[in-house]
A protein has these predicted regions:
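Short glycine-rich anion-binding loops that position phosphate/pyrophosphate groups of nucleotides
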Residues: 60-62, 154
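Structural motif
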Residues: 53-54, 103-105, 133
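Short glycine-rich phosphate-binding loop at a beta-alpha junction
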Residues: 50-60
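PRPP-dependent phosphoribosyltransferase catalytic core
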Residues: 3-20, 51, 119-171
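Active-site-facing substrate-recognition patch
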Residues: 1-48
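Short, glycine/charge-rich flexible loops or terminal/linker lids adjacent to PRPP-binding catalytic cores
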Residues: 65-108, 112-121
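Glycine-rich helix-loop-beta junction characteristic of Rossmann-like nucleotide cofactor-binding loops
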Residues: 45-50, 95-99
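Alpha-helix N-cap/loop-to-helix initiation residues
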Residues: 62, 113, 141-142
């Protein structure tokens, strides 16, 4: 997806790191219907007919739900939209007494430390549910997490230079 790569590269030129980068990235993703649609196809290609509930959060969740709400209800056993601001420490609120699934996938625009996902997983666990996979458009985590699938992974495009074990041993 060259268009996504180009847009992320442009944001990185303007905002090399931190909250300004993620705010600009999130706004760009929410405003690009082609990226949202490609993301949904990416998710469907990875779950291949398995039935999960789906969780979305914040402005990204609202954008996905507004554009694809009916599609989400047709393809997932439960749809949960959670309040935003979670990466800034807000507590997620799930307005359900009973879940429609046990296993959920979490869809988000970006992933860095897992704060948003982990806070939702904590509340979901109190309702006997769990997040089994996280799907994101942009993964900026330094260490790849096996349960996070992304369309763009920063450290695959711009790897950190670490000395290999042979370099360390020869010092």
């Amino acid at each position: 997806m060259n268009r996504l790569n180009e847009k992320i590269a442009e944001i990185l030129r303007q905002h090399p790191e931190g909250e300004p980068f993620f705010d600009a990235l999130d706004a760009m993703i929410r405003g690009d219907q082609n990226i949202l649609e490609a993301f949904l196809h990416f998710v469907y290609s990875k779950i291949e007919g398995k039935r999960f509930g789906v969780i979305l959060s914040g402005n990204f969740g609202n954008a996905m739900f507004s554009a694809y709400g009916l599609d989400l209800y047709q393809n997932f056993s439960d749809v949960i939209l959670v309040s935003g601001g979670l990466r800034r420490g807000e507590i997620p609120v799930i307005f359900k007494e009973r879940l429609g699934a046990t296993d959920y996938i979490f869809l988000d625009d970006s992933f860095y430390s897992g704060t948003t996902r982990n806070s939702i997983a904590s509340v979901l666990g109190s309702l006997n549910g769990r997040i089994v996979k996280t799907f994101v458009i942009y993964d900026g985590a330094k260490v790849r997490q096996k349960d996070v699938l992304s369309m763009f992974r920063y450290f695959d495009k711009y790897p950190i230079e670490y000395p290999g074990i042979d370099d360390i041993v020869s010092l």
